[in-house]
């Protein structure tokens, strides 16, 4: 009571979402600034950027933006006020080392520090989701990390037993049996056990996000689905047995279907998700269908993580022409997943 009037504290129900800057020499800082100029982002969440504040400040100036930076020491200080970027400043870069469009070992190390901090906050429940801007895999390897991507790094530090990448572009969702392997290695990894594990992970993830009985189409590995063994035996020896066992356990797995038609069928609404056998088999249709709005969702981590579906784009870094659409969509999808709704 204050002067006889009960005062009720207004609780901000918008989730705090950690956004990592990625590689400072790429387009990450630029697309973050561009995305956070939009009120629609602040309408649904409280963005919290993990970055080097000096780099973000430089980009704000270069884009002639009116955004203001507010350094915060902890996630609970994020206010999510439109026009202001709440940032945990790791202060881990020297501007002189950052040359847009060039491999930068210091940038790679800094980027990994942002995502490690974001994972820590997510596991502590201090942020509801993590959204990542791109890192440069070549720079990350040169910096001494053995992880070839965000997902592998997150999986290692969280001890995730089974994990996968799901790309999303409108109605098209694609989970990958494997991603960062050579084509030869990817084909060698097509096995009944691996397929079955990914089917279970996909089924459970989509159920958790509101699709009660997900229809999972499994893509064939070989042309025309192998033509009964004439063009390869993986469908008969590995994929079909995995689909059959999944069905027997209550998973609505279907296929294998020829890869040249299954993605179109998914776009038309026949399936909820497609399980692709390797990186390019899944990435190409998603990016052809909707390159700028496609995003990545991690399956199997102990927290929600979404990402842009593009790289550091060194060829256009620092020029002010990068699109932030993928990042905007990644943030919005993260909010929906927090609410338990993939669609």
Where are these regions (language model features)?
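Short, flexible loop segments at boundaries between secondary-structure elements
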Residues: 157-172, 299-315
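Ligand-binding beta-strand-loop-alpha-helix segment within the catalytic cores
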Residues: 167-189, 194-196
């Amino acid at each position: 009571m204050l002067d006889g009037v009960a005062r009720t504290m207004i609780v901000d129900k918008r989730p705090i979402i950690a956004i990592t800057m990625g590689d400072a020499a790429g387009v990450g800082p630029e697309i973050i600034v561009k995305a956070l100029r939009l009120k629609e982002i602040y309408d649904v969440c409280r963005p919290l950027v993990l970055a080097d504040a000096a780099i973000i400040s430089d980009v704000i100036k270069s884009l002639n933006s009116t955004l203001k930076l507010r350094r915060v020491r902890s996630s609970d200080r994020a206010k999510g006020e439109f026009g202001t970027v709440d940032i945990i400043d790791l202060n881990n870069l020297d501007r002189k080392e950052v040359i847009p469009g060039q491999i930068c070992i210091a940038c790679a190390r800094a980027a990994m520090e942002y995502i490690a901090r974001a994972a820590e906050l997510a596991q502590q429940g201090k942020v509801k989701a993590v959204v990542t801007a791109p890192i440069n895999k070549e720079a990350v390897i040169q910096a001494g990390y053995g992880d070839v991507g965000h997902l592998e790094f997150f999986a290692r530090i969280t001890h995730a037993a089974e994990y996968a990448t799901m790309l999303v572009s409108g109605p098209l969702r694609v989970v990958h049996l494997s991603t960062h392997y050579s084509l030869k290695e990817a084909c060698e990894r097509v096995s009944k056990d691996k397929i079955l594990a990914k089917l279970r992970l996909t089924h459970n993830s989509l159920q958790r996000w509101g699709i009660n009985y997900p229809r999972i189409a499994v893509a064939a590995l070989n042309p025309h689905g192998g033509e009964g063994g004439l063009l390869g035996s993986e469908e008969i020896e590995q994929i079909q047995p995995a689909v059959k066992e999944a069905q027997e356990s209550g998973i609505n797995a279907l296929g294998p279907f020829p890869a040249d038609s299954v993605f179109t069928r998914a776009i038309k609404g026949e399936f909820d998700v497609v399980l692709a056998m390797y990186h390019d088999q899944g990435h190409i249709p998603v990016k052809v269908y909707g390159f700028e709005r496609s995003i990545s969702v991690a399956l199997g981590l102990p927290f929600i993580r979404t990402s842009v579906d593009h790289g550091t784009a060194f060829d256009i870094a620092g020029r002010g022409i990068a699109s932030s659409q993928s990042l905007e969509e990644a943030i919005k999808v993260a909010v929906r997943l927090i609410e338990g709704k993939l669609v």
